[in-house]
Each structure stands twice: as C-alpha cells, then as structure tokens.
Amino acid sequence: MDIEKFKKYYNVALSQVYDEGNSPFHKSLTIKIVNDLIMPLQLPKEAFILDVGCGPGYFLNEMKSAGYSNLIGITLSSKDKEICEASGHQIRAMDFSFLDVPDSSVDLIFARHSLEHSPFPFITLQEYWRVLAPGALLYVEVPTPSDTRRHEFNPNHYSVLGRDMWLALFARAGFKVQTNSSITLELTNTNTQERFPETYYLFLLQKNGNS
C-alpha cells in the first residue's frame, strides 16, 4: 500500500468534517432510541460505552441521567467536543475508524448517524469488532439511499448504502444481527412548508467471536 496516497485521500475526508450543533429533531429522536432500544438492554451501570460521532452529546446526556458514568464520546469536531465537555462528559478527539481503545474492552458502541461518514465502513466495522468485548453490542443508525433529501450528496457522506449491503458488511465484519428495523419520520421543508417522509435504518448488532 502507498501510505502517502492513503494519507492524501484520508485528509480530503477529514477536511469535510462538520459540527452537528444543536438539533431539536436529532435530540428528540435520540431520546426515543434510548428509551425504546437501549434501556431495555439493561446494561450494568458500570458498562463501558462509546458514543462514536457523539455530536453535542444527546446520547451521553441521556445515559448519564440514567446513572451510567463510564462513557466516552468520540468526535473530530472541536465545537461539539467543547459543548460535550461543558456538560461534564469525557470526549476524545479521534477518528472513529481508528480508535485508541484497548481490544475487547467496550460493552456498547452507539453509532447513530456516523457510519455513513466512513469512506471505508468495512474497516470501521472491523475496528468496532476489535474494541467490543465478546458478546457486546453495537447500535447502528444510518440514512436510507435515494430519500427525499438525498443524503448521498451531503458533505462528508460516503456510505449511504442499501439495507442488504449493510447486512452483508455486518456479517463479514463478524456481527450477528439482533434487530433489523427502520423508522420513518415526517419532516417539513422550511422553505416550502411541504411535509415529506424520511426513513432511517436501525440495527442492533452483537459481536461474534472471542478476540
């Protein structure tokens, strides 16, 4: 592999990182996902949880309020990092495809609207598999292709894939699918006030294997 070429392409992707900022829509949806999918898992309060692509910390806030303290948010956005740290969260500035986290140490990775930002999702998923403990869980939420807002063309979106492709990648990376679902929401075009649907894929995955 030509490492210098890789660095060049990788730096292009890094240059397109953007701040999530405050979003009431994403905040309310994150709360719903936590209540409907994460809390029923009944993870022990000492569970080590990573929020990859943590944004301004909506998930971290909910988990902290529920009594979880072993939480780390991952982001490359300096603004989002600052917001999260102001709320008392531990945040690490790193690429979520190359985690400075020990092997088999994490109990849950929460990857809501982050995996579509990876130029190489198979590599990213292999990295998640590496850091997850045997039998540990990965939550993935991603936009669907060819939706009204055409997420394929958003800045820093590289992997807006169909359901079957995601399922194939999960299997290849060593994950067992526990939940394979979707959620459709009604959004409003702020310019025209027209309503339109938007669908996201929801997956809860479990690590297969012991190392």
Put a short name on every predicted segment:
Residues 1-99, 108, 125, 165, ...:
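Conserved N-terminal segment of class I S-adenosyl-L-methionine
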Residues 111-114:
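A short beta-strand submotif of the Rossmann-like class I SAM-dependent methyltransferase core
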Residues 119-123, 150:
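Short N-terminal helix/helix-N-cap motif within the alpha/beta-hydrolase-1
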Residues 122-137:
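A short glycine-rich, Lys/Arg-flanked "PGG" loop and its adjoining helix->strand segment in the class I
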Residues 140-142:
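Acidic carboxylate diad motif detector
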Residues 150-165:
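Acceptor-substrate binding/catalytic loop of class I
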Residues 175-186:
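Conserved S-adenosyl-L-methionine
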Residues 186-211:
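Core SAM-dependent methyltransferase catalytic element
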